[in-house]
């Protein structure tokens, strides 16, 4: 009798994806983040579902409904903070996952990589709209500032912004539609993640050496299932510690003040995971230029496969490229720091320099470094 997991129509999909999947024998812990992102997404959908049962998407009651969840609903505070800090864990895993792809040349799987970039955009859109829902000061003003950027689009900009707002300012219509989009987008993300996996399994995983690993494969289960469980336990421990000991550490205290269109907060800033892009946006004095730079700061990932000039796929054996990669990481930390600072000297200049270095590194310095390394191989 044939094994049911290999014959049952549903089970054989699971089997070929998570059990009998041939995986390289040498993939490191940097390959854990895909499964961690899956766990994050499931956790966010579940906690979000329970929050949606008690939340009301109306400007008069949204703030009170979130307070009600925290005070009156059984373990509502836990669900709310798991959801808010779960988003932070999601982005930590996302950034590490993308960084791994850049370092080890995983972007050479074009379809997988491009769907990954689409996923990044979708998750960022979801997180932005979720931040608007509690209807605190930072929710309202963040929504106003970011949606207003679309007015920089020539000719149709103003109409587009008013169409998104559903009126002449961020108001009840905006909040209601943001709630609807925030609810549906995670399911679109889940579907895209399925396609992401589908394309990945067409080629098989990359590995730290960047070499073909067809000659040395091991089954995913038990080797990588147990490894993923360990990674998941570490992440759950980190998230639990954050939620139970300092749930508001990553949030903005201004969001505990109900939204007031007549009172602008002194420093409008997004959640920490958008600060690097926000710093790039602010570093360009022109509105349209800033918006373009903001979009390009993420969209630039799509052209990275075209900028690959090295003879090896991975940076494992390329010390000069490694150096440039870590300078890029340091630059992103600098941008994140600047994004949270007020617009005054010396932060403006530091932000402009860091933004310039970011684009220069990706578009010019790293490809040239790879070409120099190619020449050094001949010596």
Curated annotation (Swiss-Prot):
Highest taxon, organism lineage: Eukaryota
GO molecular function per UniProt: metal ion binding; ubiquinol-cytochrome-c reductase activity
Cofactor needs: heme b
Protein's membrane topology: Multi-pass membrane protein
Residues noted as binding a ubiquinone in the record, renumbered to the chain: 201
Statement: the UniProt record of this protein carries the keyword Lipid metabolism: no
Subcellular location per the Swiss-Prot or TrEMBL entry: Mitochondrion inner membrane
Gene3D superfamilies: Cytochrome Bc1 Complex, Chain C (1.20.810.10)
Binding site for heme b b562: 83, 182
Residues the record lists as binding heme b b566: 97, 196
Regions that span the bilayer: 33-53, 77-98, 113-133, 178-198, 226-246, 288-308, 320-340, 347-367
Any one biological process term the GO annotation gives: mitochondrial electron transport, ubiquinol to cytochrome c
GO cellular component: mitochondrial inner membrane; respiratory chain complex III
InterPro entries found in the cross-reference section: Cyt_b/b6_C (IPR005798), Cyt_b/b6_C_sf (IPR036150), Cyt_b/b6_N (IPR005797), Cytb/b6-like_sf (IPR027387), Cytochrome_b (IPR030689), Cytochrome_b_C_euk/bac (IPR048260), Cytochrome_b_N_euk/bac (IPR048259), Di-haem_cyt_TM (IPR016174)
This protein's UniProt keywords: Electron transport, Heme, Iron, Membrane, Metal-binding, Mitochondrion, Mitochondrion inner membrane, Respiratory chain, Transmembrane, Transmembrane helix, Transport, Ubiquinone
Chief localisation class: mitochondrion
Cofactor note: Binds 2 heme b groups non-covalently.
Complex formation: The cytochrome bc1 complex contains 11 subunits: 3 respiratory subunits (MT-CYB, CYC1 and UQCRFS1), 2 core proteins (UQCRC1 and UQCRC2) and 6 low-molecular weight proteins (UQCRH/QCR6, UQCRB/QCR7, UQCRQ/QCR8, UQCR10/QCR9, UQCR11/QCR10 and a cleavage product of UQCRFS1). This cytochrome bc1 complex then forms a dimer.
Family: Belongs to the cytochrome b family.
Other remarks in the entry: Heme 1 (or BL or b562) is low-potential and absorbs at about 562 nm, and heme 2 (or BH or b566) is high-potential and absorbs at about 566 nm.
Function of the protein: Component of the ubiquinol-cytochrome c reductase complex (complex III or cytochrome b-c1 complex) that is part of the mitochondrial respiratory chain. The b-c1 complex mediates electron transfer from ubiquinol to cytochrome c. Contributes to the generation of a proton gradient across the mitochondrial membrane that is then used for ATP synthesis.
PANTHER family per UniProt: CYTOCHROME B
Protein name: Cytochrome b
Annotated organism of origin: Crocidura fuliginosa
């Amino acid at each position: 009798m044939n094994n049911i997991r290999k014959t049952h129509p549903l089970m054989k999909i699971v089997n070929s994806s998570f059990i009998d999947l041939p995986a390289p024998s040498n993939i490191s812990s940097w390959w854990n983040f895909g499964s961690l992102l899956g766990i994050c997404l499931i956790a966010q959908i579940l906690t979000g579902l329970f929050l949606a049962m008690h939340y009301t998407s109306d400007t008069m009651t949204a703030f009170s409904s979130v307070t009600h969840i925290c005070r009156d609903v059984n373990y509502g505070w836990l669900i709310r903070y798991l959801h808010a800090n779960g988003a932070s864990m999601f982005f930590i895993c996302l950034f590490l996952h993308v960084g791994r792809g850049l370092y080890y040349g995983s972007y050479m799987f074009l379809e997988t990589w491009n769907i990954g970039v689409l996923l990044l955009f979708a998750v960022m859109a979801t997180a932005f709209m979720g931040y608007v829902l509690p209807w605190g000061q930072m929710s309202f003003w963040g929504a106003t500032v970011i949606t207003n950027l679309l007015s920089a689009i020539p000719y149709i900009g103003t109409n587009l912004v008013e169409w998104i707002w559903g009126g002449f300012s961020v108001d009840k219509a905006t909040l209601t539609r943001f709630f609807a989009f925030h609810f549906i987008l995670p399911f679109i993300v889940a579907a895209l993640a399925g396609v992401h996996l589908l394309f990945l399994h067409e080629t098989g995983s990359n590995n730290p050496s960047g070499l073909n690993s067809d000659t040395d494969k091991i089954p995913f289960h038990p080797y990588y299932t147990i490894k993923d469980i360990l990674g998941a336990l570490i992440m759950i421990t980190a998230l639990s510690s954050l939620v139970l000991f300092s749930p508001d550490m990553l949030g903005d205290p201004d969001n505990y003040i109900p939204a007031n269109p007549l009172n602008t907060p002194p420093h409008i800033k997004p959640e920490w995971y958008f600060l690097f892009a926000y710093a790039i946006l602010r570093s360009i004095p022109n509105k349209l230029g800033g918006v373009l730079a903001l979009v390009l700061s993420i969209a630039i990932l799509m052209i990275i496969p075209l900028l690959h000039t090295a003879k090896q796929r991975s940076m494992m054996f390329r010390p000069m490229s490694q150096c440039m990669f870590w300078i890029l990481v340091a630059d992103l930390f600098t941008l994140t720091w600047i994004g949270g600072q007020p617009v005054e000297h010396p932060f403006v200049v530091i932000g402009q320099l860091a933004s310039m270095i970011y684009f220069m590194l990706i578009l010019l310095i790293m490809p040239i470094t790879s070409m120099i390394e190619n020449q050094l191989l001949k010596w």
